[in-house]
Amino acid sequence: MANVSVYNIEGKEVGSIELNDAVFGVEVNEHLVHMAVVNQLANNRQGTQSAKTRSEVSGGGRKPWRQKGTGHARQGSTRSPQWTGGGVVFAPKPRDYSFKMNKKEKRIALLSALSSKVADNKIVVLDAFNLDEIKTKKFAEVMSNLKVDKALVVIEGENKNVVLSGRNIPTVKVSATNEINTYDVLKYETLVVTKAAVEKLEEVYA
């Protein structure tokens, strides 16, 4: 089991915690991690892009000039792709990019991502994360105290003050333990997780 330091919101070390290898020490499955990230991005795509092919563009029914004798290259329609205002070759159409991943694969991918953060020493454990008021400045001070810039902050449950205080910081995302996913864990440089959140993750996944 990995033993990591525990800090308070002032950035001072206040103890240590042993992380369960079943959650934070698994062998990284790169294939499933990649698959989970692609799945997350694909499922988030709107898929609403659309353009018209030559058969869908209005007009162009009349041949622009006669076939021979003009000196111009032969043309059959002003709506063919090489014309301004013409249709698009292989025009994109609205489609659903999402695909399914089974729960076991998602679980392995998430645990692989969490374990990679521990292996790379990119995890910071907080004894607790509580703010008396909704204040972005206070949240930023905590990140500064921990010497953290780009971070996914994982809390054990609902904490309105923390969530709303961190919302305006573009390099930070706050998530509850039941909201985290492989993509977010890997996207942010550092994983900041409360002690209670660690216990919750180990309870669910160990």
Swiss-Prot record:
<protein>
    <recommendedName>
        <fullName>Large ribosomal subunit protein uL4</fullName>
    </recommendedName>
</protein>
<dbReference type="GO" id="GO:1990904">
    <property type="term" value="C:ribonucleoprotein complex"/>
</dbReference>
<dbReference type="Pfam" id="PF00573">
    <property type="entry name" value="Ribosomal_L4"/>
</dbReference>
<dbReference type="GO" id="GO:0003735">
    <property type="term" value="F:structural constituent of ribosome"/>
</dbReference>
<keyword id="KW-0694">RNA-binding</keyword>
<dbReference type="GO" id="GO:0005840">
    <property type="term" value="C:ribosome"/>
</dbReference>
<dbReference type="InterPro" id="IPR013005">
    <property type="entry name" value="Ribosomal_uL4-like"/>
</dbReference>
<feature type="region of interest" description="Disordered">
    <location>
        <begin position="44"/>
        <end position="87"/>
    </location>
</feature>
<dbReference type="GO" id="GO:0019843">
    <property type="term" value="F:rRNA binding"/>
</dbReference>
<keyword id="KW-0699">rRNA-binding</keyword>
<dbReference type="InterPro" id="IPR002136">
    <property type="entry name" value="Ribosomal_uL4"/>
</dbReference>
<comment type="similarity">
    <text>Belongs to the universal ribosomal protein uL4 family.</text>
</comment>
<keyword id="KW-0687">Ribonucleoprotein</keyword>
<dbReference type="InterPro" id="IPR023574">
    <property type="entry name" value="Ribosomal_uL4_dom_sf"/>
</dbReference>
<keyword id="KW-0689">Ribosomal protein</keyword>
<comment type="function">
    <text>Forms part of the polypeptide exit tunnel.</text>
</comment>
<comment type="subunit">
    <text>Part of the 50S ribosomal subunit.</text>
</comment>
<comment type="function">
    <text>One of the primary rRNA binding proteins, this protein initially binds near the 5'-end of the 23S rRNA. It is important during the early stages of 50S assembly. It makes multiple contacts with different domains of the 23S rRNA in the assembled 50S subunit and ribosome.</text>
</comment>
<dbReference type="GO" id="GO:0006412">
    <property type="term" value="P:translation"/>
</dbReference>
